A protein has these predicted regions:
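Extended beta-strand/loop cores of jelly-roll/beta-sandwich
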Residues: 1-197
Length: 197
């Protein structure tokens, strides 16, 4: 690794440390104390902000809408890709468009004052990859590639109720309602996401 900066990322040098415990006050899962070596890695210099994460959420939302509306173009072989020229024309305030996207919207019984809005639980990112670590195991030699491909959908909208659930002793209702969406909090760190998101 090097110390050069990559798009607001910094290089964290690897090293070795002692992990675990060797005294009576430790929990059972802290034994035995052992040496651990961590390779160097790149890491964001700062936490992800609401503005940065919001871009990803809205990109996912627009991707799902483009799929629903059939805004595709043919890629290599049999692959298809979203036609972003067409996707940029999606009018989120147009009643006819919203009707075509009804599968992504809150059901009528979940709307406040009947307002048609996207259902945060339907903003999901499709994750696909190849488990190299599992495929490289000696006992898996010769197994077909498809055995090591993983696919799953991950909800990406932050859990805004975390403000009330995790800090129930405080008055955090305003944060629950506006923290992620309001521009005043755009440069604040995103809250309510997990490592998969």
């Amino acid at each position: 690794g090097s110390n050069e900066n990559h798009d607001s990322m910094v290089w964290i040098e690897g090293g070795t440390f002692m992990m675990g415990a060797d005294n009576e006050q430790a929990s059972k899962d802290e034994y035995p104390k052992h040496k651990v070596t961590v390779n160097g890695f790149w890491m964001d210099a700062t936490e992800i902000t609401n503005n940065q994460y919001r871009q990803f959420v809205w990109w996912t939302k627009d991707s799902l809408a483009a799929v629903q509306l059939g805004f595709f173009k043919q890629g290599q072989e049999s692959d298809t890709a979203i036609d972003w020229v067409k996707a940029r024309t999606i009018k989120w305030n147009d009643k006819a468009t919203l009707e075509k996207l009804s599968a992504l919207m809150l059901t009528p019984d979940n709307r406040i004052y009947g307002k048609i809005e996207i259902d945060p639980d339907k903003i999901v990112y499709n994750i696909q990859g190849f488990d190299l670590k599992e495929a490289a195991k000696y006992e898996n030699e010769g197994r077909p590639r498809k055995d090591f491909i993983y696919r799953y959908n991950q909800k990406v909208y932050p859990d805004t109720l975390v403000w009330m659930r995790d800090f129930s002793y405080s008055y955090n209702e305003p944060m629950t309602k506006r923290y992620f969406a309001h521009p005043s909090f755009g440069t604040y760190p995103v809250v309510g996401v997990n490592w998969k998101q």
